[in-house]
Amino acid sequence: MSHNLKQLFQQHNVKGLSINSKTVKDKDIFFAIKGQNTDGNDFIKDALSKGAVLVITDNKKNIVIDKVIYVKDVQAALYEAIEIFYPKKPKDLIAVTGTNGKSSVVSYIAQTYSLLGKKAASIGTIGVEIFGCVNLINDVPELTTLDYLSFRKIAHNLAENGIEYLVFEASSHGLDQARLREIKVNIACFTSFSQDHLDYHHTKENYLLAKLKLFINHLLPNGIAILNSDIEEIEFVKDYLHNHNIKFITVGTKGDLEITRLNGSLKGQNINFTFNNREYNFNTPIIGSFQASNLLIAVLSIHYIGFAFDDVIDSLVEVKAVKGRMERIDNTNIFVDYAHTPDALEKALTELKNIKLRDSKLSVVFGCGGNRDKAKRSLMGQIAAKRADTIIITDDNPRHEDPKLIRAEIISGIEKADYTEIANREEAIKYGINNLKQDDILLVAGKGHENYQIIGDKKLPFDDAEVVRKCVKVCHPVA
């Protein structure tokens, strides 16, 4: 098969591989793969019309079409083709999993590499970010963990352009569906764990075991797992990894790297910690105790790749907050955060409540996504009622659900607390800003970095941060 594939590549001057007819380019080979929701065999003619030079399929019905080649196992043929066509990867790989914090840790690691003078890239929810050189990648699928072909294509492109270090997010869906296949990493990180994605995993135990596949299936034999010691299930996780002979180290208030004191304000925080019997202290413009853990997980990741610990610590003052992750909008008291789980919302509200002035108020604008875990909606309403002074319930990405019913499920958890319901997200944000008084804080939660809103089949332009900026110009809140 290898010899035949190599011959086909040469004979047809193949330029790339594709499993999505929408993204086929001239002189690609299209692999017609049957997925969970769609079958590539239904799109063979589309792929050919877009310039595919060949189609590989394991469906004999399609071999009557010109340029279609039959194989017994199309997946196996694809994986073999990937090894031939996209063989390269950056030399050191780090993967990050967790309910919340993946994007932050991935960005902090890549930023720190760059500050240490290294070429690095990150892959995840926010897309592909490249540090230390020009942006090389376009047309990235919108998945936290890419399909295997997309991942290998990007990794090969990065390596070809001199990127030495790659850090990426590994979602529970991606791990459960084995999207990473045989990819091995030097370091694997676990940032946090709480309820999410039960629409897919059904139980919290299944969800946790899916996360742990990162360490069991993808960590190199001499690799290290870096764990947040404040995960509620940390003892189970440590026992599980120990039973699989996986080396690990913990970070947090009870960690091997122990966070001993945090002093936070709207402008950032001072972090104190101990490691290897030494005390350390540094300042960061990034707020949130959970972000302190994320920063230090990033520190240990890079240290165990082979960089001097003190050099890594010295670079932290220049690491910036990630778009849509406790992002303070300009010099206002308005924050945009991706918090879309009960745990993330509670942490974000708690952090802001702790740093606000005593007599000021904390407001929150949020909704919940449609066609996603319904069990978390009332919980998020309950958390908002407990932590915020003013609650504004609005729409997130309703997708194909009735947004009014989604809002009702959130409101069912609010119980006796007062709230305002405004379906239109921009109007809800505007209302929240208009009602701010001196020193009040507003959190706009749920969408973070996203620059769209999904309503039915439509993906409409919408960016929480830009809406905030627009409303601030009109409303002139006191910062």
Swiss-Prot record:
The modification N6-carboxylysine is found at residue 211. The keyword Transit peptide does not apply. GO terms for molecular function: ATP binding; magnesium ion binding; UDP-N-acetylmuramoylalanyl-D-glutamate-2,6-diaminopimelate ligase activity. This is UDP-N-acetylmuramoyl-L-alanyl-D-glutamate--2,6-diaminopimelate ligase. The keyword Zinc does not apply. It holds the Pfam family Mur_ligase_M. Catalyzes the addition of meso-diaminopimelic acid to the nucleotide precursor UDP-N-acetylmuramoyl-L-alanyl-D-glutamate (UMAG) in the biosynthesis of bacterial cell-wall peptidoglycan. It catalyses: UDP-N-acetyl-alpha-D-muramoyl-L-alanyl-D-glutamate + meso-2,6-diaminopimelate + ATP = UDP-N-acetyl-alpha-D-muramoyl-L-alanyl-gamma-D-glutamyl-meso-2,6-diaminopimelate + ADP + phosphate + H(+). Its cofactor is Mg(2+). Carboxylation is probably crucial for Mg(2+) binding and, consequently, for the gamma-phosphate positioning of ATP. A motif (Meso-diaminopimelate recognition motif) lies at residues 396-399. It is an enzyme of class 6 (ligase). UDP-N-acetyl-alpha-D-muramoyl-L-alanyl-D-glutamate binds at residues 21, 144-145, 171, 177, 179. It is found in: Cytoplasm. One of its GO terms (cellular component) is cytoplasm. InterPro entries: Mur-like_cat_sf, Mur_ligase_C, Mur_ligase_C_dom_sf, Mur_ligase_cen, Mur_ligase_N, MurE/MurF_N, UDP-N-AcMur-Glu-dNH2Pim_ligase. SUPFAM superfamilies: MurD-like peptide ligases, catalytic domain, MurD-like peptide ligases, peptide-binding domain, MurE/MurF N-terminal domain. Keywords: ATP-binding, Cell cycle, Cell division, Cell shape, Cell wall biogenesis/degradation, Cytoplasm, Ligase, Magnesium, Nucleotide-binding, Peptidoglycan synthesis. Meso-2,6-diaminopimelate binds at residues 372, 396-399, 446, 450. Pathway: Cell wall biogenesis; peptidoglycan biosynthesis. Its main location: cytoplasm. One of its GO terms (biological process) is cell division.
